[in-house]
Amino acid sequence: MIKQAIEKVVNHENLTFEETEAVLDEIMNGEASEVQTASLLTALTAKNPTIDEIAGAAASMRSHALAFPETKDVLEIVGTGGDHANTFNISTTSAIVVAATGTRVAKHGNRAASSKSGAADVLEALGLDINETPAVSYESLQENNLAFLFAQEYHKSMKYVAPVRKQLGFRTIFNILGPLANPAHPTHQLLGVYDETLLEPLANVLKKLGVTNAMVVHGRDGLDEMTTADETAVVELQDDHLTKYTVTPEQFGLKRSQRADLVGGTPEANANITRRILAGDHGPQRDIVLLNAGAALHVAHPDLSIQAGIDLAAKTIDDAKPLKNSIRLLAFSDKRKDVVA
């Protein structure tokens, strides 16, 4: 299958969803050589992957992932990475805040790729056991409204792709597959992207993958997040319909920040930023978390406007709920480690 797929893509022909899923299955099963994998990834990059190709590849990744118990009405807050902005962990902090409102969040993430601190790095620095089994993570989702699914633990088949990606050294379809391959199969998703041209295609991909409500966002300062330093371009998926619009921080009563205000550092430094936000510190770091948490709450609860989501996130922080919930989460993680030990 992979030989025929390479030939088609080299000739600038598009693969169907089914063809892409089948050829990725070959790669994920270790049945393709590194040369074949590199050839396919290079040809897809040169052609530009279609919606069907991205969705088919994501479906294959999901099917080869470590199984996660079936969940309903679960939210994901995630970015593609690759914006080279070195911000603190905005989406991870936002996920902690959103979970404290009673909304279930299954956060799928990895260690840092283009930054100093990925979701796994900062959560580990906060004291969470990032290597929890699916059963334990599912239990955490039910008890604490928050679970972390460590990509390295769930996507073992990526071992057949990782060396090729490293040697190629340029962006491939896999740079956008991570946020689409959450084993919890989220029904609602706030997805940040590093390139504005990805907004509409990835909104359509999410639709194909069964996501019912989503916002795909790109900060025009380059962030793969809702930004407070510039406008944010949005494509929203709701009821099978896509809507394009832009937002500014000012329209939600938030001050415009400088990009320098949002820069983070090591996992330990970013963990301290998260702790300060959860403890009630005000300023640009809190504001960008409020914006992203508010958008995520709108995605999870469409009857709630972004502004109402921001207000709820602010009240939740001021009531110390995220701080208390994070303490419960860490206590739960420690308890489960003791049980396993």
Swiss-Prot record:
Manner of cofactor binding, per the entry note: Binds 2 magnesium ions per monomer.
Coiled-coil intervals, chain numbering: none
EC annotation from Swiss-Prot or TrEMBL: 2.4.2.18
Binding locations of Mg(2+) 1: 91, 225
Catalysed conversion reaction: N-(5-phospho-beta-D-ribosyl)anthranilate + diphosphate = 5-phospho-alpha-D-ribose 1-diphosphate + anthranilate
Organism superkingdom: Bacteria
Names of required cofactors: Mg(2+)
Gene Ontology cellular component annotations, sorted alphabetically: cytosol
Annotated binding of anthranilate 2, by residue: 165
GO MF term list: anthranilate phosphoribosyltransferase activity; magnesium ion binding
Pathway of action: Amino-acid biosynthesis; L-tryptophan biosynthesis; L-tryptophan from chorismate: step 2/5
SUPFAM superfamilies, sorted: Nucleoside phosphorylase/phosphoribosyltransferase catalytic domain (SSF52418), Nucleoside phosphorylase/phosphoribosyltransferase N-terminal domain (SSF47648)
Keywords carried by this UniProt record: Amino-acid biosynthesis, Aromatic amino acid biosynthesis, Glycosyltransferase, Magnesium, Metal-binding, Transferase, Tryptophan biosynthesis
Subunit structure: Homodimer.
Family label: Belongs to the anthranilate phosphoribosyltransferase family.
Entry protein name: Anthranilate phosphoribosyltransferase
Organism: Lacticaseibacillus casei
Upper taxonomic lineage: Bacteria, Bacillati, Bacillota, Bacilli, Lactobacillales
Gene, per the UniProt record: trpD
